């Protein structure tokens, strides 16, 4: 799997203190994911909660199949998770 994003729309480093490349680290561990069905985006968007180093992040992405069969995970947005999202991720990934 490879990652991509629109560099012109990525204001994350300046506005949020991290870039999309940093945000891809959440996929190295367990993520809590749900489909974003709030409206029709013309594509299947997924909201993923996870951790990159010591930071809880929420990343919105869509998967696109490449001609080679490889998956291109296109990052749409990334931000620090809010309290509710951090608690949901912790609950979902904690051992009983």
Question: What residue spans do the PLM features occupy?
Answer:
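Ribonuclease/tRNase effector modules and their secretory precursors
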Residues: 1-96
